[in-house]
Amino acid sequence: TPPGRFILFDSLRDKDTIRVLREAKEPVVSALDELKDKGIRSIRDFYADPARLELAQGLDEFRRKKLMASCDNYAILREALWMLYARPFDPVRFGQLISAHHANLRDGLGISTPEIEQILQTAMANGAYGGKVNGSGGGGCCYVYCATEDAEKILRAVEAQGYPGHILKGDKGNCVEA
């Protein structure tokens, strides 16, 4: 568990999960299918050989934008995963990665909402390192990552705008101890 806290917020906006996921996924799957004859089987192929991203230039703008956002999010995921095991841990960079992931979801895949953006902007203005939509997007929840000492202030600022939140406490979970 990284140091600091995660705060989960509810945007109080209903969403159509199946529609949101379909609209984000189908163009990426279609783009990958079109690139199959060029040796592309998955997003991981672009991560393994970034020069292959040039192949996306032959796609229409709509699918290219969604594919590129998905490729970038995979690279962000890999860096963030590596950071969780790195010492010393850099909470500021970790927050930046979370926000960069959200930017791809918002700008590339179109799955944020004005409510989610308001929550994230308020949290960032009050000290959060980063934040993103949670789950399928299109409404629902988001979370932010922050220093432990800033969590209550961030929670109060966002709740003052009418969005309930909950500070999450990390735990190592179930494990086998020798």
Locations of the language-model features?
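C-terminal nucleotide
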Residues: 1-130, 144-178
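N-terminal pre-core extensions flanking Radical SAM catalytic domains
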Residues: 138-144
